[in-house]
Amino acid sequence: MKGDSRHLNEEEGASGYEECIIVNGNFSDQSSDTKDAPSPPVLEAICTEPVCTPETRGRRSSSRLSKREVSSLLNYTQDMTGDGDRDDEVDDGNGSDILMPKLTRETKDTRTRSESPAVRTRHSNGTSSLERQRASPRITRGRQGRHHVQEYPVEFPATRSRRRRASSSASTPWSSPASVDFMEEVTPKSVSTPSVDLSQDGDQEGMDTTQVDAESRDGDSTEYQDDKEFGIGDLVWGKIKGFSWWPAMVVSWKATSKRQAMPGMRWVQWFGDGKFSEISADKLVALGLFSQHFNLATFNKLVSYRKAMYHTLEKARVRAGKTFSSSPGESLEDQLKPMLEWAHGGFKPTGIEGLKPNKKQPVVNKSKVRRSDSRNLEPRRRENKSRRRTTNDSAASESPPPKRLKTNSYGGKDRGEDEESRERMASEVTNNKGNLEDRCLSCGKKNPVSFHPLFEGGLCQSCRDRFLELFYMYDEDGYQSYCTVCCEGRELLLCSNTSCCRCFCVECLEVLVGAGTAEDAKLQEPWSCYMCLPQRCHGVLRRRKDWNMRLQDFFTTDPDLEEFEPPKLYPAIPAAKRRPIRVLSLFDGIATGYLVLKELGIKVEKYIASEVCAESIAVGTVKHEGQIKYVNDVRKITKKNIEEWGPFDLVIGGSPCNDLSNVNPARKGLYEGTGRLFFEFYHLLNYTRPKEGDNRPFFWMFENVVAMKVNDKKDISRFLACNPVMIDAIKVSAAHRARYFWGNLPGMNRPVMASKNDKLELQDCLEFSRTAKLKKVQTITTKSNSIRQGKNQLFPVVMNGKDDVLWCTELERIFGFPAHYTDVSNMGRGARQKLLGRSWSVPVIRHLFAPLKDYFACE
């Protein structure tokens, strides 16, 4: 993973975070009731459920750009950067691939002072430090109420990544005004356009109006008289340590309702979220130096950055007297095209002089402001989970870095209070005045509600929820997306061990291990993380002896999960009375369920499969010689169909995870998009259940990703009336693949044990004369770049002295399939990997299905 920034990767057909609008009922789009009315299965599921929570009403609508529109939007930028030769595949979530350009131009000044030449940082943007927080459109994890400054739009950016996440600006385009989250944005009336309505949303009550006009400017003639550049009203690029350049405007201290700026400092208001920051004048440059500081990676990735660019250039356009033609209904991207060309061309004809403020013009954007103190910034940090990582492209073009950091916006909030609390905790524990188990290891709060699974210490409610959601989220390079200790962090150090996927944030190292530890770690190469080192204790960071068991317990014994009645237990059937099994498989994929049943020797009387992918159907039909009966799209299956095909003894399925996975920036949640397909499984499951008085054994199983929102997980559990178990395929295969499984299969929560035939190491899966460079690989997804491993994106295999990717037959063995299982209908390598990336791990399903041998006839 080399480049100026690195973006979150998808974990399972989903990708990168952008602007998610589902807000647990607090903010939804304003589309019509008819449009947002749930499908009959959803209505049935909701009506069947006695409790209808606000989460069920979250809505989000989105639109997508065509490839042609995306290409036209980015062509001029590629020309200026001189790149575009190498493109990464970007999955828009609908099965189409979009080619996005990579940036080889080095983003200026993206390194922090603390970095050594051997260390490359990966920045993600979205927020800044301290003042630079965006309000999260989703309120979860028991955080404090949402109070945020609502001013001129801005969000702190990330610098450019050469390896793009699966979802980019192309796949997550600017939504229609009715559905875009503008909770922190109000467009000045003077710069509004008829084509794109960027006015404030309806969630801006109780805000003050801040207007600074020419009179206030004249009255501040003595402000900023320190022989430094930039006065009130100047349009600038600002730089905060750890983040890339972001557009802003110099304002008077009176506009901030704070104190006067210190000598050599300037108050600036960031475009995008309207926050104010006091920043050194030496870290400001004129907006006229546009090409040197414009960040193509962030523009392609972040809606907030495009919004900031729009308002910045609209302000510049007004000052320069520049006009652009537009047509009604024109998208934001279309309006930005000529604006960006104008900016990259030097703001001709007026040039930089035309951008200077006119004393007759307002010098602060006429935007509504909601005041809040730092305590109310807490929920804001979660908005941009699309955390971008930045690296230095020029170095990347020469050779892979020996060591990299990744920097993200998730920890960009003001963590001052948390760090002070953790410092006190560390001091007390060091002086034997406190117990780690009595404090939250992530934030330092007292009276934790749960234990930390890896290290001695606890977790408070909000940190535990965050841990549940994000611990199994991985980036494109295979590393965890967030810190192993706190599941956030702004700057993350990556373990150098090839088989390790852990990363640790600078904050945790400095507070828990010791001051200066992070700087020392940056200079070490290789650097082994605290999960790999043989020594367990480092400062107050003490690895648990039984961390592997604790980790399993953490995801299966959630104290906040609703207690359900234990599933009905069926006594084992005597061998003489067992009969072949009858199966209904929804979202069947490549017939993993049928394959496992046959491997276990269970006789299958009928296997009815619902699948819409033609390639998957081809695999199942050819490899199982027509023994599988394929039926309609799951949405078209009726109760009458179930009665005709049934009865069934086993119902299995795993609905698409695109709109549930946290790694998807455009995810729509459980109640929209593909997320609502869960309810198709739910209502068909109810149709297949035995009638009252029928005591025949009946089993079912539902699967989905671990990296989903806690509320979605709870809703699924509530409808299915049971809690899930979490199983990671790493225990029985050569690849990570953590999944939740709901169901009533006997012994679902028993320990996972590998069989003698399971291929536990990569070398066991390779063809002759090929050598594995590591024992295990990270989660293999539908993306081709998920094959490369580690922070340097290394090829996992060596053959004849040359590095190589995994072959399709080797991928099949990793998943537990027979070699050439997907080799049908002339499918290419990419298509075969996509089928495998969406499939189940055969050893895991074998582990779950094995108890069925006590109930059904075997061969």
From Swiss-Prot:
GO MF, any single term: DNA (cytosine-5-)-methyltransferase activity, acting on CpG substrates
Span of domain PWWP: 232-290
PTM annotation: Sumoylated.
SMART domains with a match to the protein in the record: PWWP
UniProt region (Disordered), positions on chain: 25-226, 348-429
Biased composition (Basic and acidic residues): 103-114, 214-226, 370-381, 412-426
Phenotype when changing V824M: Significantly reduces activity
Biased composition (Acidic residues): 85-94
Chain residue ranges for the region called Interaction with DNMT1 and DNMT3A: 1-305
InterPro entries tied to this protein: ADD, C5_DNA_meth_AS, C5_MeTfrase, DNMT3_ADD_GATA1-like, DNMT3_ADD_PHD, DNMT3B_ADD, PWWP_dom, SAM-dependent_MTases_sf
Phosphoserine modifications at: S96, S116, S216
Ranges of Low complexity composition bias in the record: 167-179
Effect of A609T: Significantly reduces activity
Record's keyword annotation contains Phosphoprotein: yes
UniProt-listed Enzyme Commission number(s): 2.1.1.37
Biased amino acid composition, Polar residues: 189-198
Effect recorded for V725G: Loss of activity
Comment field on protein domains: The PWWP domain is essential for targeting to pericentric heterochromatin.
Designated name of the protein: DNA (cytosine-5)-methyltransferase 3B
